[in-house]
Amino acid sequence: MTPMSMNNFPRVFLKNKEEKEIQQGFPWVFDNEISHVKHRADEKSEWKNESLAECSIEDGKLVEVYTKAGGFLGSGIINKKSKITVRILGTEHGDEISADTKAYFEKKILEAFNMRRMFYKDSDSYRLIFGEADFIPGLICERFCDVKGRIFIVVQFLSLSCE
């Protein structure tokens, strides 16, 4: 576990012993697993601890996830209206992801595409991107080929984190 970062991203702290699944690669943090949220209104204001219900973080924002003891677990997108409150993007700190968001997601998409090409090189129809399995929560992309050989891509956005 890496230490707490010095950036300004909101921090979601899990309840005691709730980190095990995240450490094993599970991509979701449920609302009942969250102890509190630490954030500040702007760079000049003080950090404040609030319950999930009280916190004013805008849904769709990048947050960092920590153990109760303060060990860094990963970064994800928050949606307080969902039972799946945080969808993990990866084990990078928020500033690494936000430094070049476009490049970050292009890399994730290319990694997913290259993996599928290895397994489906002789197939004309398959799932290109499989959401959380590719660390792109809520995004499903499928490639289909019809009898005339035309290729179609079907895209589904299944969560706020993807929109």
Model feature map: region roles:
Residues 1-163:
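RNA-binding accessory domains that recognize and position tRNA/RNA substrates
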